[in-house]
Amino acid sequence: MSVELWQQCVELLRDELPAQQFNTWIRPLQVEAEGDELRVYAPNRFVLDWVNEKYLGRVLELLDEHGNGMAPVLSLLIGSKRSSAPRAAPNAPLAAAASQALQAAAANAAPAAAPAPAPAPTSAPAKKAAAQKAAEVSEEPSRDSFDPMAGASSQQAPVRAEQRTVQVEGALKHTSYLNRTFTFENFVEGKSNQLARAAAWQVADNPKHGYNPLFLYGGVGLGKTHLMHAVGNHLLKKNPNAKVVYLHSERFVADMVKALQLNAINEFKRFYRSVDALLIDDIQFFARKERSQEEFFHTFNALLEGGQQVILTSDRYPKEIEGLEERLKSRFGWGLTVAVEPPELETRVAILMKKADQAKVELPHDAAFFIAQRIRSNVRELEGALKRVIAHSHFMGRDITIELIRESLKDLLALQDKLVSVDNIQRTVAEYYKIKISDLLSKRRSRSVARPRQVAMALSKELTNHSLPEIGDVFGGRDHTTVLHACRKINELKESDADIREDYKNLLRTLTT
């Protein structure tokens, strides 16, 4: 009976919690029953402490509500339910098995394939090996190859972008840089980049018949460049003789200026209009460059008319690029425009585990979770944080622990805590919606105030470690059920209301960048 009651409570928690939190902390729980006792297993003290603070109270409430007066006695253990000698943790909470959460995250990140079976309970060493293997499915994108620590004998030298020179007759020498380390195989896929990855693969595997142009947009360090290089590398793998040209938009401008200086503009046009695939990064740098926009406009038209593939990236939606001609914005919308969002928690953990594995460094799962929960903005910041931790570990001759991470990232963590405080969230939301902070704390229920208040509560729940009662208290003394309702409402609206979805995304980016 205890196991059935537990499963019932888990289903209720699935409805109450955001999918990310449920999948990370609740879904992988290991339980077993013996008589009236329900044993719940967690992998380590870090996870126990986290769940104790965030979820234990609600779990006990549900067990009591649905146990018909016969709620089971909970025994909380550290280990696995098949472990021969689990370690008791008196007064410890229910917890998620972090290693299995990693397996679930990596499974979600893998390219579409046959559904993987649910992980069976295993011994702790086997779980660790399986989680590490799962984390190796892919690698999160970055502009530069990973070089965690210069001078460390245990690490490989960084792999630089390969220079691929395409020579044509005339005065100009055209160079395309494709980074061979950026492939689809080592790209970590998650909810934040799933559509972008699928679209890029469609273009790479079926050029000229997929989406043309493909326009990827999003903040820095989220994987746009990785996907662009992955397409180019796949095209060359299929056809080594293909003329695939990757360049930054400023390089296109520089080439055009040089062509004008050398009186070789016809050669410039002939080269760029004869490629099989043109990949241009950071197209927003064309803004207010009228001659460059004019030339690119005609090049773009010629390529699409000839059935050649065009892929573009930008840090913002094309129609939001100020100083870009409307005719270009219109043409960029002819194909598919896809946003690349900041990675969610599971993906961030998988990134860190993969990068640590590449660097041949042992990164405990609780350490990966600790970093991932605090560095939310983009992959480059994650990599930078991990590099500092690895360097600190190497120079101090110490293993990577939570304590060492706190020491090595002290300034960064202090800044993050300052940026994502509830006070700062309230101030940022009030400024965004052009209302007063006092409105957020008031009893006013008009939609112009109530909706921003709900957004601020949802952001506080996602970005801080405060409990629901604590959040309610700083929003005018509201109770935890009001905060829970606000979070559920905003999650629903993000699925159905494009304006709320865009507002939430903009605020999240502001608070975590």
Swiss-Prot record:
Coiled coil stretches, renumbered: none
Chief location category: cytoplasm
Region (Domain IV, binds dsDNA): 394-513
Subcellular location: Cytoplasm
InterPro entries xref list: AAA+_ATPase, Chromosome_initiator_DnaA, Chromosome_initiator_DnaA-like, Chromosome_initiator_DnaA_CS, DnaA_C, DnaA_dom, DnaA_N_dom, DnaA_N_sf
Residue numbers spanned by region Disordered: 113-163
Residue numbers spanned by region Domain I, interacts with DnaA modulators: 1-87
One Gene Ontology cellular component annotation held by this UniProt entry: cytoplasm
A molecular function (GO) term: ATP binding
Biased composition (Low complexity): 123-135
GO biological process per UniProt: DNA replication initiation; regulation of DNA replication
Keyword RNA-binding: no
Ligand binding (ATP): G221, G223, K224, T225
PANTHER family given in the database record: CHROMOSOMAL REPLICATION INITIATOR PROTEIN DNAA (PTHR30050:SF2)
HAMAP family per the UniProt record, alphabetical: DnaA_bact (MF_00377)
Subunit structure: Oligomerizes as a right-handed, spiral filament on DNA at oriC.
Domain-level remarks: Domain I is involved in oligomerization and binding regulators, domain II is flexibile and of varying length in different bacteria, domain III forms the AAA+ region, while domain IV binds dsDNA.
Function, as annotated: Plays an essential role in the initiation and regulation of chromosomal replication. ATP-DnaA binds to the origin of replication (oriC) to initiate formation of the DNA replication initiation complex once per cell cycle. Binds the DnaA box (a 9 base pair repeat at the origin) and separates the double-stranded (ds)DNA. Forms a right-handed helical filament on oriC DNA; dsDNA binds to the exterior of the filament while single-stranded (ss)DNA is stabiized in the filament's interior.
Family recorded in the similarity comment: Belongs to the DnaA family.
Name used for this protein in its record: Chromosomal replication initiator protein DnaA
Organism: Pseudomonas fluorescens (strain ATCC BAA-477 / NRRL B-23932 / Pf-5)
